[in-house]
Regions:
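Short coil-to-beta-strand transition motifs
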Residues: 1-5
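Conserved hydrophobic positions within beta-strands
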Residues: 7-9
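Long, highly charged, low-complexity intrinsically disordered interaction regions
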Residues: 11-78
Length: 78
């Protein structure tokens, strides 16, 4: 399980951040709140929530990133 990913922000949209850490680019789904918090930054740390969807051939592993632990905790309560 990942606690956070820290690295260079290489791509950013209001819904997705790509963070390069140790030569790997992680595509991380983000909230608009996180987008506002990291916009304009070169290096970021995103607190991660992992989601695994198992559906036969459509299995997926999705990362959700948050600028703060508090925002991640709130998301997990939903």
């Amino acid at each position: 399980m990942f606690e956070y990913i820290k690295g260079e922000l290489t791509e950013l949209t209001p819904a997705l951040a790509v963070v390069e850490a140790a030569g790997v680019g992680y595509a991380i789904n983000i909230s608009l709140n996180t987008y506002s918090a990291i916009q304009g930054k070169k290096d970021v740390r995103l607190f991660i929530h992992e989601a695994l969807s198992a559906g036969g051939r459509d299995d997926s592993f999705t990362l959700y990133g948050f600028a703060t632990k508090k925002e991640r905790e709130l998301y997990r309560l939903l």
